Each structure stands twice: as structure tokens, then as C-alpha cells.
Curated annotation (Swiss-Prot):
The keyword 4Fe-4S does not apply. The keyword Acyltransferase does not apply. This is Renalase. It comes from the Bacteria. Substrate binds at residues 57-61, 96-98, 185, 308. FAD binds at residues 13, 32-33, 40, 56-57, 128, 302, 309.
Length: 328
């Protein structure tokens, strides 16, 4: 009997590792506490259509990741997004064009992880609470008390604070991961029946509770029935308002949006708030991945590198590479 490899987390990092291991002929089984894959790369279904509440776009600087992105493009899962960009600084809104190539999933961000997952076995709505090792193999315990296993190795591909709670069997790794701080982000979606009279499709914001905003419908193949906008608050504002109600957050960020935009803003016909508790690492690390190869446990995620989508993908590749290297 072939004992599969367990991978906890179906964001970009976990699926990147899963793809690399599957390509090398290994069996994997994925676990995720959510109802679908993607993590911060997921799109939220709503009455206003699919909304990219998390990652807004991504860039490809590393040659290996750029190759993967070109494959996704050829398969029809991603497209370039060329928004009319603005910058808001010192109370002034000004055009801010650049040469950066930006990619988005189509018809939503979750198209990418859905394609990466393919037909790999996965247990959704399954929150793993404990990872423990028997004499030969690993087993996982979920929040319902159900046991999963045996597994030959475990890869934990979650935000650092969630990973550290699963590393009781690997105290050295646990202490490193426990030192990683991640910043929160409040995200708000607003939809308007009458399109806002502005050419702006994306905006980097300074001196405001907002950090970024985007016209969701300006992305390729998005639903354009309503004029949908995604607002991201700064890490600082999000931390200060971590426990605010969704209604309070929507009201405050809607107000900040109205202050900076250079047109009349009607009342939205739809609004939604989502709190990303672990949106991005507070500092940069250059680990690639973390591992205790003798134990057979590996940790990866965007926080092991740049905090970007590319960093998550590269971290998953590195975790898989280390695991395969140890098997040789």
C-alpha cells in the first residue's frame, strides 16, 4: 500500500507543493478548513457576482513562476489586467501609470487554484487541529475528533499562526514559526447600480484608512451588471479595528472612499465586509520553506518568502523539493 502525503491548506503554496509531488509520482491528500480551495486567492460568490476579496492581482518576477503563469494563461485560467491606475497622496488623486505586468485569474481569482487542484483528493470543511506521529507514520485529528491517516509526510501550508499550533510534534519548527507575525486586512466590497463617473480602475492610497481600491468589473471576464469596487484597509487601521462590526467597517471605509474619489457617490445597492486575520507577513523572510526532514514534516507559505502570490508558489515548490530530496 502506498502511503500518501498529507497537505494542510489549499492556497497557492499547498497546491504548488501538491502539484510538484504528484508530478514526481507521489500520492497526496489535501485538507482545508474552508468550503473551497484558494485561501486568500479565492473569489467570494455574492449577489453582486464573484468578488476578489483577497489577492487583487499578482506579478511574476521569478523565471520558474513566470513559466507556470504562462501555462495558466495558455489553459485560459489567467489573463493580464491593465487597469487605469491612480495614486492618492496628500489629499490629491492623480494618474499613476506604470509598466508592471499584472495577472488575475479568470473569471475570478479562484479559477487558478481550482485548476491547480484538478482531481487531487481533498477534504474540505475539515479543520485539522492536531498533527501527530506514530511509530512509522503521521496522523491528523480534525475539529470533529475524526482521525485521518496514515501519511508518510506532512506539509503544512497555512498562515504562520495557524501552522504553529499544528507543530507540537516538531518543537524546533514550532518555535521558529511562532516568531512570525502576520498583519490583518479588512476588505470591503461595494456595488453601485449606476457606474461611478471616474476612469479610475485601481488606486494605491496613502494618508487614509485605505491602502488600495479596485474596480472589480474592470478585470477580464468579470460580471459587469453592477459597478463593483473592492476596498482594502491598511494593516494599521485593520489592527486598530480588528473587532469592529462589519457594518462599522463598511461605513468607515465607504466614507474614506467617498472622500478620495473625484465624483458623486450614490448609496451602494450591495455591501460586504471580510476580515483577513492573516493577510500578509509583517516582515520579509528568506526561508523558502521550513522542514524537519528526519521527522518528515514541512512548512510552506507566502510568509516564508516575500508575502506575495509568487512567494507562496515558490515556497510550495521548495517544500516539495526538500521532501523529494530527502526520499532519494
Amino acid at each position: 500500500m502506498t502511503v500518501p502525503i498529507a497537505i494542510i491548506g489549499t492556497g497557492i503554496a499547498g497546491l504548488s507543493a501538491a502539484q510538484a509531488l504528484t508530478a514526481a509520482g507521489h500520492q497526496v491528500h489535501l485538507f482545508d478548513k474552508s468550503r473551497g480551495s484558494g485561501g486568500r486567492m479565492s473569489s467570494k460568490r455574492s449577489d453582486a457576482g464573484a468578488l476578489d476579496m483577497g489577492a487583487q492581482y499578482f506579478t511574476a518576477r521569478d523565471r520558474r513562476f513566470a513559466t507556470a503563469v504562462k501555462q495558466w494563461q495558455a489553459q485560459g485560467h489567467v489573463a493580464e489586467w491593465t487597469p487605469l491606475l491612480y495614486n492618492f497622496h496628500a489629499g490629491r488623486l492623480s494618474p499613476s501609470p506604470d509598466e508592471q505586468v499584472r495577472w488575475v485569474g479568470k473569471p475570478g481569482m479562484s479559477a487558478i487554484t481550482r485548476a491547480m487542484r484538478g482531481d487531487m483528493p481533498v477534504s474540505f470543511s475539515c479543520r485539522i487541529t492536531e498533527v501527530f506521529r506514530g511509530e512509522e507514520h503521521w496522523n491528523l485529528l480534525d475539529a470533529e475528533g475524526q482521525n485521518h491517516g496514515p501519511f508518510s509526510h506532512v506539509i503544512i501550508a497555512t498562515p504562520a499562526p495557524q501552522a504553529s499550533t499544528l507543530l507540537a510534534a516538531a518543537p524546533k519548527l514550532a518555535s521558529v514559526v511562532a516568531g512570525v507575525k502576520m498583519d490583518p486586512t479588512w476588505a470591503v466590497a461595494l456595488a453601485f447600480e449606476t457606474p461611478l463617473q471616474t476612469p479610475m480602475q485601481g488606486c494605491f492610497v496613502q494618508d487614509s484608512p485605505l491602502d488600495w481600491l479596485a474596480r472589480n468589473r474592470s478585470k477580464p471576464e468579470r460580471d459587469d451588471t453592477l459597478d463593483t469596487w473592492i476596498l482594502h484597509a491598511t494593516s494599521q487601521w485593520s489592527r486598530q479595528n480588528l473587532d469592529a462590526s462589519r457594518e462599522q467597517v463598511i461605513e468607515h471605509l465607504h466614507g474614506a472612499f467617498a472622500e478620495l474619489i473625484d465624483c458623486t457617490m450614490p448609496a451602494p445597492v450591495f455591501s460586504l465586509a471580510h476580515r483577513w486575520l492573516y493577510a500578509r507577513p509583517a516582515g520579509a523572510h528568506e526561508w523558502g520553506a521550513l522542514s524537519d526532514a528526519d521527522l518528515g514534516i514541512y512548512v510552506c507559505g507566502d510568509w516564508c518568502l516575500s508575502g506575495r502570490v509568487e512567494g507562496a508558489w515558490l515556497s510550495g515548490q521548495e517544500a516539495a523539493r526538500r521532501l523529494l530530496e530527502h526520499l532519494q
